Swiss-Prot record:
GO cellular component, one term: ribonucleoprotein complex
One protein family per Pfam: Ribosomal_L20
Xref: PANTHER family: 39S RIBOSOMAL PROTEIN L20 (PTHR10986)
GO BP, sorted A to Z: ribosomal large subunit assembly; translation
Keyword terms: Ribonucleoprotein, Ribosomal protein, RNA-binding, rRNA-binding
Matches recorded under NCBIfam families: rplT_bact (TIGR01032)
GO MF annotations in UniProt: rRNA binding; structural constituent of ribosome
Stored InterPro entries: Ribosomal_bL20, RIBOSOMAL_L20_CS, Ribosomal_protein_bL20_C
Family: Belongs to the bacterial ribosomal protein bL20 family.
Protein name per its UniProtKB record: Large ribosomal subunit protein bL20
Gene: rplT
Protein function: Binds directly to 23S ribosomal RNA and is necessary for the in vitro assembly process of the 50S ribosomal subunit. It is not involved in the protein synthesizing functions of that subunit.
């Protein structure tokens, strides 16, 4: 039986790796061995950072809410505590969006939270 070297499959795999590393620096986009290492690391970072993005976005929302709350005379913690006491169930993503795009509505929500906190 003749030996099969698998040249076509290898060539396709190499082309795929080199296509994925297009834009990488130096030999990381042209030499297969270096490109493969670069691709594995890049994919690993992409996987980890897709998960890290969730926390990053939450931190951004909290920062925005805190800034808007301070403009209304409350701290972030006081606002969130007041919302819980008032029974207003709005998540941080919506609150942050409201703080940027609809400041009047955010001010009304902050006023209700402050009133609930005062009682």
């Amino acid at each position: 039986m003749a030996r099969i070297k698998g040249g076509l499959a290898t060539h396709k795999r190499h082309k795929k790796v080199l296509a994925l590393t297009k834009g990488h620096a130096s030999t990381r986009h042209s030499l297969f061995k270096r490109a493969h290492e670069s691709m594995v690391h890049a994919m690993s970072y992409a996987f980890a950072h897709r998960r890290a993005r969730k926390g990053d976005m939450r931190r951004l929302w909290i920062t925005r809410i805190n800034a808007a709350a301070r403009a209304e005379g409350l701290t972030y913690g006081e606002l969130i505590s007041g919302l819980k006491v008032a029974g207003i169930d709005i998540n941080r993503k919506v609150l942050a969006d409201m703080a940027i795009s609809d400041t009047v509505a955010f001010a009304a929500v902050a006023a209700k939270a402050a009133a609930a906190k005062a009682n």
